[in-house]
Amino acid sequence: FTDIADFVIMDEDGSVSIPVEGGTRMTENLVGAHFPEYDGFLVLSHFKGHAIAGFGGAIKNISIGMASQEGKCLIHTDGASHTSPWGGAQDPFLECMAEAGKSVQDSLNGNILYINVLNRLSVDCDCDSSPAEPDMHDIGILASTDPVAIDQASVDLIYEAEDGASLVERMESRNAEHVLQHGEEIGLGNRSYDLVSID
């Protein structure tokens, strides 16, 4: 990919702290040290299942995806560890993801466009070393300026799909929609949306 464009490893030079406003679990989020160099992002997410979060989409990418190594550990452990990502309780982890995402969005004054690609829909994340093969059809591509709305629409389309049972089970068994509920409660976005089809 370096033949296509230059790239930056956001946390290759460590972490920088950004504030979490209105959170119930976090007061700061640790993102990559290069984060302040940007005034906006296009967040392209392959929507899919996830072994811990239930699903991964826009919110996961602006929280876990933007976090430094230390920040990832803080999100996963409800602030208990800077060095290990394991051992946190499920709902607090989901709430920390929403709050970390809000800190990123607030720091950029909402200057983010989100695109979720709903294809090759597996119960597992691309970060899994041996993910399950997709077992449902491709759905399409969504775009929004609201990370909660785009992830809610993505979840709803999975529920509407005739072949979405395995991904629905993955989401429900992880209480995945809690990240959307908490995200809406803290002002990250809105679960209500209008789905406009563009052919």
State where each predicted segment sits.
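Extended, low-polarity segments enriched in aliphatic/aromatic residues
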Residues: F1-D199
